C-alpha cells in the first residue's frame, strides 16, 4: 500500500531534478530545510528521526541534495522526507513536507476493532510487511 503523507503524495515519485526544484523554491522563500527518516509509516508517527540539523542558512539546493543522498545511502529501505520550516515570527511551523524516498516493498496497515466496557470500541492499527 502506497503511503500518502505530505505534499505530492498522490503523484508519482519525484525525480531528483523535481526535488531540487522544490527545495530551491523553499530556500527562495527563506524556509529552512530538514531531512527526516523512519521505518514506521504509521499515520500517527509524527516523530521521525532527524538526519543532522535543519539547514537554516542555505541559499543553494545542492547542500540539501548532498544530505539527502547521504541519508539515502544510510537508510535505503526507509521513508525519507524533506520538511520546509518557516521561522517567521507568528508562524514558526512546517510549511511544506514531502516524501522523497520509499522502501522497495511498502508495508500495509490493517485496522482491528474491539469492543470494551459500555459498548465502547477501540481501534488499533497494525503494520504488515
Swiss-Prot record:
GO BP, one annotated term: reductive pentose-phosphate cycle
Coiled coil: none
Residues that span the membrane, as ranges: none
InterPro entries reported for this sequence: RuBisCO_ssu (IPR024681), RuBisCO_ssu_dom (IPR000894), RuBisCO_ssu_sf (IPR036385)
GO molecular function: ribulose-bisphosphate carboxylase activity
Keywords carried by this UniProt record: Calvin cycle, Carbon dioxide fixation, Plasmid
Sequence segments annotated as region (Disordered): 109-129
Pfam families (UniProt xref): RuBisCO_small
Subunit structure: Heterohexadecamer of 8 large and 8 small subunits.
Additional note from the record: The basic functional RuBisCO is composed of a large chain homodimer in a 'head-to-tail' conformation. In form I RuBisCO this homodimer is arranged in a barrel-like tetramer with the small subunits forming a tetrameric 'cap' on each end of the 'barrel'.
Function comment: RuBisCO catalyzes two reactions: the carboxylation of D-ribulose 1,5-bisphosphate, the primary event in carbon dioxide fixation, as well as the oxidative fragmentation of the pentose substrate. Both reactions occur simultaneously and in competition at the same active site. Although the small subunit is not catalytic it is essential for maximal activity.
Protein name: Ribulose bisphosphate carboxylase small subunit
Gene source species: Rhizobium meliloti (strain 1021) (Ensifer meliloti)
Lineage: Bacteria, Pseudomonadati, Pseudomonadota, Alphaproteobacteria, Hyphomicrobiales
Amino acid at each position: 500500500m502506497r503511503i500518502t503523507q505530505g505534499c505530492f503524495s498522490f503523484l508519482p515519485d519525484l525525480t531528483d531534478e523535481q526535488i531540487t526544484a522544490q527545495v530551491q523554491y523553499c530556500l527562495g522563500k527563506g524556509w529552512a530545510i530538514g531531512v527526516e527518516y523512519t521505518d514506521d509509516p504509521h499515520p500517527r508517527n509524527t516523530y521521525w528521526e532527524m538526519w543532522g540539523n535543519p539547514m537554516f542558512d542555505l541559499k543553494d539546493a545542492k547542500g540539501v541534495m548532498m544530505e539527502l543522498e547521504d541519508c539515502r545511502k544510510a537508510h535505503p529501505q526507509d521513508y525519507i522526507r524533506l520538511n520546509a520550516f518557516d521561522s517567521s515570527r507568528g508562524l514558526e511551523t512546517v510549511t511544506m513536507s514531502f516524501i522523497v524516498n520509499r522502501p522497495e516493498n511498502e508495508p500495509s496497515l490493517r485496522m482491528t476493532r474491539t469492543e470494551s466496557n459500555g459498548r465502547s470500541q477501540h481501534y488499533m492499527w497494525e503494520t504488515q510487511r
